[in-house]
Regions:
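N-terminal intrinsically disordered/low-complexity leader segments
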Residues: 1-17, 87-88
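Helix-turn-helix
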Residues: 21, 29, 33-71, 75
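Short hydrophobic clusters on alpha-helical segments that form packing/core surfaces
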Residues: 22, 26-30, 177, 216
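Amphipathic, non-transmembrane alpha-helical scaffold segments
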Residues: 69, 73, 139-150, 205, ...
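Amphipathic alpha-helical segments used for helix-helix packing
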Residues: 117-140, 188-194
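Hydrophobic alpha-helical segments that form the core
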Residues: 120-129, 166-188, 207-211, 215
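Hydrophobic alpha-helical bundle segments that form small-molecule/ligand-binding pockets
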Residues: 147-171, 219-221
């Protein structure tokens, strides 16, 4: 399994570790062509290694894909884990205002952090493909990147509404907002054009935060 530290090396741009170079090249190839279509020789070429090195470090293409998915999920869990801990305390205390504030901070911080990571658009493609056509690795992606954050937000929304929002309704609302985090984090051409933005920096994220705050205030009264 690819360790979380290896994904951090990819994010930081550290090319000293051949495993990180292989994984970075693999992320791009899996995003573009899927597991079945990915070209192991192309991954070796892009990473400046060879097929033997990929087999040595990951056991082949299947092992490399498993490592990328596991590393992606572990990296995500490490980023958002502190929010989950804080949310559990807030929900236990039934603090409506704090729950609303944390929901906004969680969503905006996620966009702020992930929109600056160059490999996120490729990771989003891998996530979307797994969601649309699940492989044996789907559960790992689903648990970390779909189920946990949506359930977390749903609990915050229920708490923020003073318990008036039912779980099913909260999940629908949470999923709608969480989907937008992935969309904005990928900084797709469609999103930039829709808003008339040339890029998405701090100014644009601040506008999103203001809009989101208004939506949550009106919805979670």
């Amino acid at each position: 399994m690819i360790e979380c530290g290896l994904i951090e090396k990819i994010v930081s741009g550290d090319d000293s570790d051949p495993k990180a170079r292989i994984a970075r090249a693999a992320i791009g190839e899996f995003a573009l062509r899927s597991l079945d279509g990915a070209r192991i020789r192309e991954i070796a070429k892009i990473s400046g290694t060879n097929v033997a090195a990929i087999s040595y470090h990951f056991g082949g293409k299947e092992g490399l894909y498993n490592a990328v998915v596991a590393g992606m999920s572990d990296y995500f869990d490490k980023i958002v884990g502190p929010y989950y801990e804080e949310g559990a305390e807030i929900c236990a205390a039934k603090n409506c205002a704090a729950a609303r504030a944390l929901a906004i901070r969680f969503l905006i911080d996620a966009i702020r952090k992930f929109s600056t990571v160059k490999i996120v658009p490729a990771l989003c493609l891998i996530m979307s493909r797994e969601a649309a056509s699940p492989s044996e690795y789907f559960q790992r992606v689903y648990g970390s990147i779909y189920e946990k954050p949506v359930e977390f937000l749903a609990r915050l929304f229920i708490t923020a509404s003073g318990g008036r929002t039912e779980h099913g309704e909260a999940v629908v609302f949470a999923q709608a907002l969480w989907s937008n985090v992935r969309i904005y984090s990928s900084k797709s051409e469609a999103i930039l054009r829709l808003h008339g933005w040339r890029d998405m920096g701090e100014l644009e994220i601040s506008l999103l935060e203001k809009s989101l705050s208004k939506v949550l205030e009106k919805t979670l009264k």
